[in-house]
Amino acid sequence: MSKVIFHVDVNSAFLSWTAVEKLKNGEDIDIRKVPSVIGGDEKSRHGVVLAKSTPAKKYGIVTGESLYHARKKCPNILVFPPRFDTYRKASESMMNLLKRFTPHIEKYSIDECFMDVTNDLRGMESVEFASIIKERIKNELGFTVNVGISTNRLLAKMASELNKPDKINTLYKHEIKDKMWPLPVGELFMVGKSMKRKLNELHIKTIGELAKYDVNILKAKFKSHGNMVWEYANGIDNSDISRYRDEIKCISNETTLSMDLTDTEKIHKILVTLCENLGQRLRDANKYCTSISVNIRTSDFRNYSHQKKLKNAVSSTRDIILYADKIFNEMWGREPIRLLGVQLSGLCSGSSVQISMFDEKTDTRNEILDKTLDSIRKKYGDNVIMRSVLLEKEEK
């Protein structure tokens, strides 16, 4: 039996959640129905548009452009600052509601998730079941979502993007040719601006042209990423839904940069800082991780995430840095970066960890070193001992 996978994506999440909060507080205007945007910090980011209403979109306002340009297009546009605590609570409310329908949920980001409802349809058709979920979110939480339906995560995610807002879209294998292949190749999941440019140089303009291209040439030019996007263009995705649980299943850390970065050395130092924090939190929880993922958001607000499953569980900061750095170097296409994050998942306790006998001495030394550093930092502060790569930054 084929799986039934939903991708639930909040429509203009930040703006919608701000609108819901304002209406709850007694304000008369629904900012979703007038030209409005959620804007960033004007001092440090020059006021970029983080989210926009549908009426604002009609003025040509796009996510990622400056508030200055947005105001030139629509002088009377309403601008509201982001409220991340509000967004976190709204996201949690949605996840709690969705758990009533199935326990098989993977939270992909703050405003989207995957659901494996294969065994939860209760005799209903998938579109009917999705409609119930969509309407429950609208009626109980006050905002709208798109639901994409297919047999795997990739096609469900692509389906949710086909027609917005407040829509249910399907994208099954037999629909790929008509619904997905005509789309520009840049709209395919995991094809960023840099990859799009390189594919265009090969005269690949649409997803369909990518699907029909010689995969061996793509692998020769782009290695594993070339094979992956070719598979995605053909609707191939064998990944499973990681079940959402109330207990800690992952530890993550991310930072929004004060300016867009392309400098490899500076980015590496930020990555090291994130991993230092994660390593200590992992050890504080007496956990090891079996999977590491790196997330980036580019200057044009495109999100990318690559994950690596590890042969052996790790908890040392050194290992986390080495894996995260390798993953980042494999995925980054040199686009300017505005957000960088690292996530540790597949957590397990020390009693279930198997260490390779070849690495046992090194792992033991790293474990002792990390625990010693953790103890010193807790007592005297995070900056009392720093890795040389970070110390060089302070000395310059």
From Swiss-Prot:
Localization annotation: Cytoplasm
What does it catalyze? DNA(n) + a 2'-deoxyribonucleoside 5'-triphosphate = DNA(n+1) + diphosphate
Q: How is the cofactor bound?
A: Binds 2 magnesium ions per subunit.
Q: Name one GO cellular component term.
A: cytosol
Q: What molecular function terms (GO) are annotated for this protein?
A: damaged DNA binding; DNA-directed DNA polymerase activity; magnesium ion binding
Catalytic center residues: E112
Enzyme Commission designation: 2.7.7.7
Q: Which PROSITE patterns match?
A: UMUC (PS50173)
For whether the record's keyword set contains Cell membrane, the answer is no
Q: Where in this chain does the record put each UmuC domain?
A: 5-192
Q: Is ATP-binding tagged as a keyword?
A: no
Q: Where is this site: Substrate discrimination?
A: F14
Which residues are involved in binding Mg(2+)? D9, D111
| UniProt keywords, alphabetically | Cytoplasm, DNA damage, DNA repair, DNA replication, DNA-binding, DNA-directed DNA polymerase, Magnesium, Metal-binding, Mutator protein, Nucleotidyltransferase, Transferase
Cofactor(s) this protein requires: Mg(2+)
Question: Which Gene3D superfamilies does its entry note?
Answer: 3.30.70.270, 3.40.1170.60, 5' to 3' exonuclease, C-terminal subdomain, DNA polymerase, Y-family, little finger domain
Location, primary (coarse class): cytoplasm
Note the superkingdom of the native organism.
Answer: Bacteria
Alphabetical GO biological process terms: DNA-templated DNA replication; error-prone translesion synthesis; SOS response
Q: Which family does it belong to?
A: Belongs to the DNA polymerase type-Y family.
Question: What PANTHER family has UniProt attached to this entry?
Answer: DNA REPAIR POLYMERASE UMUC / TRANSFERASE FAMILY MEMBER, DNA REPAIR PROTEIN HOMOLOG YOBH
Q: How does it assemble?
A: Monomer.
What functional role does this protein have?
Poorly processive, error-prone DNA polymerase involved in untargeted mutagenesis. Copies undamaged DNA at stalled replication forks, which arise in vivo from mismatched or misaligned primer ends. These misaligned primers can be extended by PolIV. Exhibits no 3'-5' exonuclease (proofreading) activity. May be involved in translesional synthesis, in conjunction with the beta clamp from PolIII.
Name it.
DNA polymerase IV
Organism the protein comes from: Clostridium acetobutylicum (strain ATCC 824 / DSM 792 / JCM 1419 / IAM 19013 / LMG 5710 / NBRC 13948 / NRRL B-527 / VKM B-1787 / 2291 / W)
